[in-house]
Amino acid sequence: MKINFFLKSTPINYQRQILIDFADKVGGNCIKSDGYEECDVAVIFGSWKKTPKKKWKLMLQHHFTKVNIVENHRDKPLIVIETPLLGRTITDNHEYHRVGLNHFMRGLADFKNENSPSDRFEKLGLKIKPWRKKGDHVLIVGQNMNDASLFGIDFSWWIKNTIQHLRRHTDRPIVFRDHPENKDLMKNLIDTYEWCNVSYSNEGTINSDLKNAHCTVAYT
């Protein structure tokens, strides 16, 4: 079986080293070219989009390398290494990663975690708090409007639809906390809903919004 690890699927040396170490352990091939090379199993690092929405990303070859690999490796196993979701910090040198078969997102990837033991989760040291039954407001948590997890959805439309849906079921105050990457892009939209007790929050940290929230709503 030929297993190719595509080093140029990421520009970050630390992540390339993960691919190199992985390849060494399983007897794989480290591919240094910008494009796809025929194999039985392909291994890449990071998510992909056919056309990055951020202009500066259009200049980065690794985005096009991954699209080329995905399109030419159809109907064969693709292993995708991506950033972690739990306990994630702002760094490129993560201690843990998610590894998906054929994709990187829940619902599309097979993470081979059905009936898996809890040892890896326990190593993260996360504590699950009891289900909250009290709280003052409903917190809507924003997402980076260019994030791959949105799969091209108009996030402004999702916010408007979500607010309208919530208002049919609750009269609690609604607080919208946006993703910091968006700056103030959503503020004008949220301000148009001020009449129905919807507010935009950008002060302090998200912890203050979570503290007294009755529940949270998020797209991903």
Predicted segments with their positions:
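N-terminal pre-catalytic "stem/leader" segment of glycosyltransferase-like enzymes
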Residues: M1-K50, N146-D147, P173
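Catalytic donor nucleotide-activated moiety binding site of glycosyltransferases and closely related
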Residues: F5-T10, I163-E203
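Short, charged/polar "capping" segments at the starts of alpha-helices
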Residues: P11-Q17, K50-W56, R88, A148-S149, ...
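Active-site donor-nucleotide binding/catalytic segment of nucleotide-sugar enzymes
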Residues: K129-D184
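Well-ordered, non-membrane alpha-helical segments in soluble/globular domains
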Residues: Q15-D21, W56-N68, D154-H165
